[in-house]
């Protein structure tokens, strides 16, 4: 159905020079088959899919003249823009990673689905609305008769992704490209979306290109897999062969970096344990034997000192009902737990289960409706803001999204020094600067990072900056709110190892919030 031959894509850099990001890859997608394209951020997965859809920015990118993308024997790269627009959306459709960026917030979901049907299939407005309702039912949207008139912002993340799928299959495409469609979703919703995609693929006899950075998902949905790194294909073949008997060192490294439910090594293996860069190429190193890694014992003896004692914690939100009434929604319903000093409590649950709300309540970023949180014997929820300010530095939070939690107008140095200035840590700015530089070194970032801005760093590096910012205040409790869920597998391993090292060194206590069971089991002493 689709044949990619020697695809080479280049992008313009700041010096107006073209840098090759996809370096001569070739692969094919047979009819009625799912092919998974796996790789970390920057491997060229999304660029490959955008090139197939004709969505690369013409002013800053170029595709080599000898590259071909053949769809049913026709080279898509030779098609005029008008003909390409007819093909994309009808014969080839795409589901993007972030549904809220892809859906128009000021149009109802029904009108957005109907627009595609009117444009590509020439339906009347009435016909298109009726078909949009059928599609919402087909993708499993609850109460579709009401949701058809809802705006994207009124739907959950999983529901938004279902709407994106409905839009993609509206014209019964022959090829569906799914670009990281489950990355931001919790495990249960992720499974539902994967099952939905597979059932729709079989029902409509489509082929699918499934793009992901998570090798664990590949076995559930794909027939064949292609592993990419730095714009090149490292390995491709049948899923069973690649996952069970990987030939390439990078594929082996990716499989070993991920935490496993059955093992708890002292440190997670990292890509650098298996391969080292030498010029433009990589050499196999194998500095560790995965099977003989020292295991870490987890759990509590019952003799530990309790640093945080939460009792009957409650939080309610209220929404308007009618003209004068209000409706109560209980986000946290009488939760109690204890956190031992120097240990990790894992909080697991789906989206909307109240995990993040508990973290925000303990930070007093939201006010609790009821309950107590005893820190060193003092109820921090009952304190005035002035009293709590003394305790605030002892409890810190690492947020899920490192792109949103760092001030883009501040340099990393300013980001690290600001909390020290607020809390009076350090005699003067030169002492604070030295403390900040020491922390950057501790989280494995170069000293030059002090003078740079957040946008100049990758997601994993930004999360290290967020961790360093928390450490400036010498906290005793760190709340990690989905702090590794948006990261690539190898970067996730680096951050988990860093958190483990910091806990061993400073005796930190963690509340680790996640929807990933293997990660929680790896790092936690107790789970709730």
Predicted regions and their residues:
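Conserved ABC transporter NBD signature motif
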Residues: 63-75, 371-379
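ABC ATPase NBD coupling module
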Residues: 75-93, 119, 241-246, 323-326, ...
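Conserved signature/switch motifs of ABC ATPase nucleotide-binding domains
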Residues: 89, 153, 171, 455, ...
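Conserved ABC ATPase "signature" region
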Residues: 127-146, 379, 430-448
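Short catalytic/signature loops enriched in Gly
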Residues: 142-146, 239-308, 319-323
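A short, proline-enriched helix->beta-strand linker immediately N-terminal to the Walker B motif
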Residues: 170-174, 472-476, 492
């Amino acid at each position: 159905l689709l044949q990619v031959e020697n695809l080479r894509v280049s992008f313009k850099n700041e010096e107006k020079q073209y840098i090759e990001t996809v370096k001569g890859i070739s692969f094919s997608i047979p009819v009625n088959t799912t092919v998974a394209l796996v790789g970390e951020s920057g491997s060229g997965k999304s660029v490959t899919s955008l090139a197939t859809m004709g969505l690369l920015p013409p002013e800053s990118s170029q595709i080599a003249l000898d590259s071909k993308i053949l769809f049913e024997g026709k080279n898509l790269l030779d098609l005029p823009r008008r003909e390409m627009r007819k093909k994309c959306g009808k014969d080839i459709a795409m589901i993007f990673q972030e549904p809220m960026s892809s859906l128009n917030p000021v149009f109802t979901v029904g009108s957005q689905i109907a627009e595609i049907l009117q444009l590509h299939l020439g339906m009347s407005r009435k016909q298109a609305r009726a078909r949009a309702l059928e599609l919402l039912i087909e993708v499993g949207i609850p109460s579709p008769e009401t949701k058809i008139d809802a705006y994207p912002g009124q739907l959950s993340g999983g529901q938004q992704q279902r709407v994106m799928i409905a839009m993609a299959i509206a014209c019964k495409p022959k090829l569906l490209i799914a670009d990281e469609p489950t990355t931001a979703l919790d495990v249960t919703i992720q499974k539902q979306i994967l099952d939905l995609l597979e059932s729709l693929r079989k029902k409509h006899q489509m082929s699918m290109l499934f793009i992901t950075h998570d090798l664990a998902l590949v076995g559930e949905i794909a027939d064949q897999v292609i592993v990419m790194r730095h714009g090149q294909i490292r390995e491709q073949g049948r899923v069973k062969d690649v996952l069970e008997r990987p030939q390439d060192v990078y594929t082996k490294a990716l499989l070993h970096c991920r935490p496993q439910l059955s093992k708890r090594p002292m440190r997670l293996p990292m890509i650098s344990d298996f391969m080292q860069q030498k010029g433009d190429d990589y050499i196999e190193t194998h500095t560790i034997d995965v099977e003989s890694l020292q295991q870490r014992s987890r759990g509590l003896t019952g003799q530990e000192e309790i640093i945080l004692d939460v009792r009957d914690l409650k939080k309610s939100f209220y929404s308007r009902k009618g003209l004068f009434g209000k409706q109560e929604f209980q986000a946290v319903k009488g939760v109690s737990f204890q956190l031992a000093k120097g240990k990790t409590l894992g909080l697991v649950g789906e989206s909307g289960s109240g995990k993040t709300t508990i973290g925000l309540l303990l930070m007093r970023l939201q006010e609790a409706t009821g309950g107590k949180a005893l820190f060193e014997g003092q109820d921090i929820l009952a304190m005035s803001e002035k009293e709590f300010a003394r305790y605030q530095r002892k409890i810190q939070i690492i947020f899920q999204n490192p792109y949103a939690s760092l001030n883009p107008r501040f340099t990393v140095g300013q980001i690290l020094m600001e909390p020290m200035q607020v809390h009076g840590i350090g005699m003067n700015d030169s002492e604070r600067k030295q403390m900040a530089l020491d922390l950057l070194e501790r989280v494995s970032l170069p000293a030059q990072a002090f003078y740079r801005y957040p946008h100049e760093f990758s997601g994993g590096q930004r999360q290290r900056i967020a961790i360093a910012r928390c450490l400036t205040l010498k906290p005793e409790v760190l709340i990690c709110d989905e702090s590794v869920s948006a990261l690539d597998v190898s970067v996730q391993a680096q951050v988990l190892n860093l958190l483990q090292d910091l806990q061993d060194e400073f005796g930190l206590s963690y509340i680790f919030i996640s929807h990933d069971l293997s990660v929680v089991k790896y790092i936690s002493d107790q789970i709730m």
